[in-house]
Amino acid sequence: MIESQRHSYHLVDPSPWPISGSLGALATTVGGVMYMHPFQGGATLLSLGLIFLLYTMFVWWRDVLRESTLEGHHTKVVQLGLRYGSILFIVSEVMFLFAFFWASSHSSLAPTVEIGGIWPPKGIGVLDPWEIPFLNTPILLSSGAAVTWAHHAILAGKEKRAVYALVATVSLAIVFTGFQGMEYYQAPPTISDSIYGSTFYLATGFHGFHVIIGTLFSIICGIRQYLGHLTKEHHVGFEAAAWYWHFVDVVRLFLFVSIYWWGGI
């Protein structure tokens, strides 16, 4: 496949990974339901499904890297399609988190009789937003600045500087995750403490999960940059990871204002 390709099709070799990923997701879902209810063998099926799903993700992305780096299949048209796909994926995640913000706003603006007609509900301890949550916010935003630094370094052809910037990104992300764990350990409410606890842990936990995923993306990009896979002409994988990381940064700002600060008043 050459750069002068005139059609927009993303032609790849036949792959077993879509069907294996579907089977892994099915086993994970069924195993999760069996484990929660609980049925015998649920934990085993859940574990096997997760292992199978993670293995499929690893080998599938490995094949994508081979197609782009070694085989030259990712032409400019294909790269454009991958960028569109990344944007649509991030939009779907925005909708997911929007549901949690909606639930929190709906519950706080119109508290029901069951929780005493006040927000936060009477008797529920709340987290001080000006302690760990406030400290964690600039830490995560700084990691976003480091990603931007890495992007400019790649565009300038400065490979070592890009690696250093990605190391800084990952380090700050790990610090953020550690503080998030401390926050959960010290937080007064539990996830079963009325709608307040449920929306608090769903929103912050889902965001924390995204931070972990983004950290893994940044680690992979750092390794690929060190190996010389990323150039100023071809770095779609890094761009997708950077967009994802900036999305996580923006969500953190909304979380701090609406969940930690305003929602905890």
From Swiss-Prot:
Enzyme Commission numbers on file: 7.1.1.9
GO molecular function, one term: cytochrome-c oxidase activity
Keyword Nuclease among record annotations: no
GO CC annotations on file: mitochondrial inner membrane
Enzyme class: translocase
Residue stretches spanning the membrane: 16-36, 41-61, 84-104, 137-157, 162-182, 200-220, 245-265
Signal peptide positions on this chain: none
Alphabetic keyword roster: Membrane, Mitochondrion, Mitochondrion inner membrane, Translocase, Transmembrane, Transmembrane helix
Membrane topology: Multi-pass membrane protein
Catalytic activity: 4 Fe(II)-[cytochrome c] + O2 + 8 H(+)(in) = 4 Fe(III)-[cytochrome c] + 2 H2O + 4 H(+)(out)
Pfam families: COX3
Subcellular localization(s) per the UniProt record: Mitochondrion inner membrane
Matching InterPro entries: Cyt_c/ubiquinol_Oxase_su3, Cyt_c_oxase_su3_dom, Cyt_c_oxidase-like_su3, Cyt_c_oxidase_su3-like_sf, Cyt_c_oxidase_su3_a-hlx
A GO biological-process term: mitochondrial electron transport, cytochrome c to oxygen
Complex and partners: Component of the cytochrome c oxidase (complex IV, CIV), a multisubunit enzyme composed of a catalytic core of 3 subunits and several supernumerary subunits. The complex exists as a monomer or a dimer and forms supercomplexes (SCs) in the inner mitochondrial membrane with ubiquinol-cytochrome c oxidoreductase (cytochrome b-c1 complex, complex III, CIII).
Known role: Component of the cytochrome c oxidase, the last enzyme in the mitochondrial electron transport chain which drives oxidative phosphorylation. The respiratory chain contains 3 multisubunit complexes succinate dehydrogenase (complex II, CII), ubiquinol-cytochrome c oxidoreductase (cytochrome b-c1 complex, complex III, CIII) and cytochrome c oxidase (complex IV, CIV), that cooperate to transfer electrons derived from NADH and succinate to molecular oxygen, creating an electrochemical gradient over the inner membrane that drives transmembrane transport and the ATP synthase.
Sequence similarity: Belongs to the cytochrome c oxidase subunit 3 family.
Protein name as annotated: Cytochrome c oxidase subunit 3
Organism per entry: Oenothera berteroana
Native organism taxonomy: Eukaryota, Viridiplantae, Streptophyta, Embryophyta, Tracheophyta
Gene that specifies this protein: COX3
